């Protein structure tokens, strides 16, 4: 019943990076040899065996009834040894190309992947790419002060991936803005996001009836609605009350799942202001997945940086305040980089 070297017992990663499994002590009335394996996701067939001698587990004799015996093993022994390689760390917003809209986008990572392939680099680390919009100003440009640990920043969407507007005059207007923003020596954060937000609304109004019926969209929504609905509600309330400080949101100041369900109900006459965030996150997920798959196909790993903590005016602080010490702050002392110090 333990597998007999042919049928692996699947372990849980619910406590990642630890992998765990519970087994009956009745199975261990004699010494047991075992190894760890990596299995394929689709059929659970063994893809890789760990190297080295078999691991050995001696019989467990419980001192009292209902005893628990815990075994902590060493790490998986990869047959090719531990990975070692060089990489590059870069903010996505700095990867502007001729195809960009004034800022580096997920689509632009492809060219960095190609460069890594040419130079022998094996890993790309990007600065945080989560949504940071709290004030709709340049203050939101700091990538480490996100309003969510789940949603991605709409700024990184490659607009052609959403489709073209049917209005040719509008497309010409956006192309002119794109060229102007792309020609500037620095990222015009406010200008980029103002223009992109306008495009998002126009393309959403045009294509949402069809996109909302796509099976791929419906699967995305069902798989992510636990965080997607609170995120969309947060963005709507942020704009409605003109602040990301949820403590000023009157009856919504204290998170209530029932109120959020009412707020995100498709029958609401303002539902388009909710659904546009679903729409953006669907395409962000799609475009990022495509570029990560492209990187993997070239033998380049993708790695993301994350902030040290959450913003006090964030979705997680609103929905799960019991998980955080919201009276605490973190930062760094003064140095040559920031002579006044930093308050993160």
What do these predicted regions represent?
Residues 2-3, 13, 28, 49, ...:
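A generic structural signal for short, solvent-exposed coil/turn residues
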Residues 35-37, 125:
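Short, conserved beta-strand segments within well-ordered enzyme catalytic domains
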Residues 1-30, 37-62, 101, 139-144:
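Aromatic-rich carbohydrate-binding modules that target alpha-glucans
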Residues 316-344:
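Active-site-adjacent "gating/activation" loops or surface patches in catalytic cores
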Residues 55-78:
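Extracellular beta-sheet/turn segments enriched in Thr/Pro/Gly and aliphatic residues
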Residues 77-321:
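Acidic/aromatic-lined carbohydrate-recognition and catalytic surfaces
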Residues 45-50, 65-71, 245:
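Short, well-ordered strand-loop elements centered on a beta-strand within folded domains, enriched
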């Amino acid at each position: 019943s333990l597998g007999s070297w042919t049928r692996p017992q699947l372990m849980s990663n619910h406590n990642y990076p630890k992998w765990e499994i519970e087994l009956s002590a009745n199975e261990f009335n004699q010494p047991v040899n075992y190894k760890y394996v990596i299995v394929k996701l689709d059929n659970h067939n063994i893809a890789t065996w760990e190297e080295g001698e078999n691991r050995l587990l001696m019989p467990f004799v419980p001192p009292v009834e209902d005893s628990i015996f815990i075994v902590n093993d060493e790490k998986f022994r990869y047959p090719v040894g531990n990975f070692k390689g060089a990489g590059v760390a870069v903010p996505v917003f700095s990867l502007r190309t001729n195809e960009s809209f004034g800022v580096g986008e997920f689509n632009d990572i492809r060219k960095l992947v190609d460069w890594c392939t040419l130079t022998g680099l094996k890993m790309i680390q990007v600065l945080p790419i989560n949504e940071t919009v709290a004030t709709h100003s340049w203050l939101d440009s700091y990538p480490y002060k996100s309003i969510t640990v789940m949603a991605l920043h709409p700024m990184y969407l490659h607009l052609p991936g959403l489709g073209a507007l049917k209005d040719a005059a509008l497309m010409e207007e956006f192309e002119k803005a794109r060229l102007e923003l792309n020609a500037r020596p620095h990222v015009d954060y406010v200008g980029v996001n103002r223009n992109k937000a306008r495009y998002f609304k126009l393309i959403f109004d045009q294509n949402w009836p069809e996109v909302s019926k796509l099976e791929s969209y419906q699967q995305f929504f069902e798989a992510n609605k636990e965080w997607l609905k609170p995120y969309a509600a947060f963005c709507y309330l942020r704009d409605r009350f003109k602040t990301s400080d949820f403590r000023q949101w009157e009856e919504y100041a204290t998170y209530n799942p029932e109120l959020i369900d009412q707020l995100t109900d498709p029958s609401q006459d303002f539902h388009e202001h909710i659904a546009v965030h679903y729409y953006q996150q669907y395409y962000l997920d799609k475009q990022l997945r495509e570029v990560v798959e492209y990187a993997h196909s070239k033998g380049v790993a993708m790695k993301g940086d994350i902030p040290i903590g959450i913003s006090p005016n964030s979705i997680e602080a609103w929905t799960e305040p019991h998980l955080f010490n919201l009276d605490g702050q973190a930062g760094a002392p003064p140095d040559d980089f920031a002579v006044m110090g930093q308050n993160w």
